[in-house]
C-alpha cells in the first residue's frame, strides 16, 4: 500500500502543474492499481493536492511574500493579488454548483481519455496560431484578463481537461507570454487547490483515520517533491519549447486508454 501511495503521490506531483491533467491521471492510475476505496481515495487526494500546492508556495515564497506585503501596505501594489482572487471565483462557484453532477457522470476512464484527446487537439491548435505577446509578466496582467483566465479554469471541472492546461492555453490566447501564463496558472493553483482540499476535508472528515497516516504522509511527501521538480523543469522547458509535446502526449495516452478499454486488454474500473 505504501508503494502504491508513493506512485500516486508521484503522479500527482508530476502532473498537477503540467497541461496533461492530474485528475485524469489519478483516476486512471488509481483504477489500474486498485488503490483504496472511493471514499478513502478522495481523502488521500486531499493530502497529495496539498503537497503539490505547498510546492508552489515554497518555490515562489519570496514573490508571494512581496505580493502580500505590497497588498497590505498603504499605496502598495495589489494588482496581482486581486487578479488571483478574481480568477479564482468562477471555478469556485461552478465547482460548488456542478461538481457533484460532473463526478457522477464524467469521472470514468473513457470520459477522461476523450478529454485527453480533445485537450491535446486544442493545444495543437493554440500553438499553430500566431502568438502576439501583450503581457510579458504576471504583474502586468489586467483584472479583466485575470477574470477570463478564471473562466477558462472552469473547464478543468471536466476530468482529463487539466486545470493547468486550461489556464495556460487560455492565457496564451489572451496574449500572455508563455512564462506569464504558466506562472499565473501556478499562482491561481494555490487558492484553487487549497479551497478544494479544505472543502473535501470537511466533506470527508468522518473517513479520516489514524491508521492511514503513513499512507497519506508518503503520498504528501512524494507529491511535494515531484511537484517542486516539475515546476522548475516546466519553467526551463517553456523558455525554449512550445506546449506541443504535451499535446501529442495527451492524444497518444488518450488513444491508448480507449484502445485498451475497447479491446478489454486492461480492465478499467467504472
UniProtKB/Swiss-Prot annotation:
Keyword Plastid: no
EC assignment: 3.6.1.27
Tree of life domain: Bacteria
Stretches that traverse the bilayer: 79-99, 105-125, 155-175, 182-202, 215-235, 242-262
Membrane topology: Multi-pass membrane protein
Pfam families: BacA
Reactions it catalyzes: di-trans,octa-cis-undecaprenyl diphosphate + H2O = di-trans,octa-cis-undecaprenyl phosphate + phosphate + H(+)
Extra information: Bacitracin is thought to be involved in the inhibition of peptidoglycan synthesis by sequestering undecaprenyl diphosphate, thereby reducing the pool of lipid carrier available.
Annotated family: Belongs to the UppP family.
Protein name, UniProt field: Undecaprenyl-diphosphatase 1
